[in-house]
């Protein structure tokens, strides 16, 4: 065993037997290598592991040096919002579909992870967004997002009228089905489907992408990630929501505004040494191959 990582957390919410098999393989392999291993409580229960150290995501974030997330991007997003609050590195084994955030191939994960544990990896910091639903002199409702914060109707799709302020300066008003506010990490997710630009992860930028705007002039807008975005609503309704990574919903009540800004903390994401963001885009999005 080396000194790069001493305590490793195993994280994920398995949805099919093959994912559970990967969790079990990973646990037993790390134990034979002499690492201290903390298994997320739900995984330990489903695998019926005995005499194993278990913990919540927060406890893994506090105690472990590295968290290995087994699953798809959805599992990674759910875990990363909590793990980003702590000084822990995170890597993923892909047991989902595209796997933009989960680099390791499940068929070769053991060898790839062995190289990472020997210190052969690259690291990067991915910033998160913080969304606040607030009204003057009232308690705020707050959540965070790795990919995007989305304004949308709560139940039935309909046009929303709202105003956008950037650093408290009026930017534009819009009638649309909603608005996607995305990080560079989320620029290959929901934002991309709505016609937003792809941003490389190192950019300190946020994109604002309209959803089906009732105009031909609305276009995605890219702003500095240090900016604060305020959403105000011209016709008060009580059926609007803000969703974070399509996993957490915050209802918007009459008279409330929405504030979106960059979080104070980052996700410490690591990759195998041969990782290339552009190669990932080409592979996942089916871009054309080189001509010569």
UniProtKB/Swiss-Prot annotation:
InterPro entries xref list: ATP-NAD_kinase_N (IPR017438), ATP-NAD_kinase_PpnK-typ_C (IPR017437), NAD/diacylglycerol_kinase_sf (IPR016064), NADK (IPR002504)
Disulfide bonds: none
Residues the record marks as active site: 73 (proton acceptor)
Amino-acid biosynthesis is among the record's keywords: no
Gene it is expressed from: nadK
Name assigned to this protein: NAD kinase
Keyword NADP set for record: yes
Protein family membership: Belongs to the NAD kinase family.
Cellular component terms per the entry's GO annotation: cytoplasm
Annotated source species: Shigella dysenteriae serotype 1 (strain Sd197)
Listed PANTHER family: NAD KINASE (PTHR20275:SF0)
Class of enzymatic activity (EC top level): transferase
């Amino acid at each position: 065993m080396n000194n790069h990582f001493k305590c490793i957390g195993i994280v994920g919410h398995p949805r099919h037997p093959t994912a559970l098999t990967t969790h079990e393989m990973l646990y037993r392999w790390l134990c034979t290598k002499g690492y201290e291993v903390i298994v997320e409580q739900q995984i330990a229960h489903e695998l019926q592991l005995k005499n194993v150290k278990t913990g919540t995501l927060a406890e893994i974030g506090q105690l472990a040096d590295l968290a290995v997330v087994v699953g798809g991007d959805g599992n990674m997003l759910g875990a990363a919002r909590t793990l980003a609050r702590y000084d822990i590195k995170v890597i993923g084994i892909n047991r989902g579909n595209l796997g933009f955030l989960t680099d390791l191939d499940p068929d070769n994960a053991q060898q790839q992870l062995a190289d990472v544990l020997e210190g052969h990896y690259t690291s990067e910091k991915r910033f998160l967004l913080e969304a606040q639903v607030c009204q003057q002199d009232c308690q705020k409702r707050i959540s965070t997002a790795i990919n995007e914060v989305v304004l949308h109707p709560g139940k039935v799709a309909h046009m929303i009228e709202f105003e956008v302020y950037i650093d408290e300066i009026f930017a534009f008003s819009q009638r649309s089905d909603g608005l996607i506010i995305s990080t560079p990490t989320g620029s290959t997710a929901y934002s991309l489907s709505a016609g937003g630009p792809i941003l490389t992860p190192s950019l300190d930028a946020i994109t604002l992408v309209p959803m089906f705007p009732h105009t031909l002039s609305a276009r995605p807008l890219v702003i500095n990630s240090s900016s604060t975005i305020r959403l105000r609503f011209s016709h008060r309704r009580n059926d609007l929501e803000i969703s974070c990574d399509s996993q957490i919903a915050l209802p918007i009540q009459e008279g409330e505004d929405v504030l979106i800004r960059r979080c104070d903390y980052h996700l410490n994401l690591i990759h195998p040494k041969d990782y290339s963001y552009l190669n990932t885009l080409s592979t996942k999005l089916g871009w054309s191959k080189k001509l010569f």
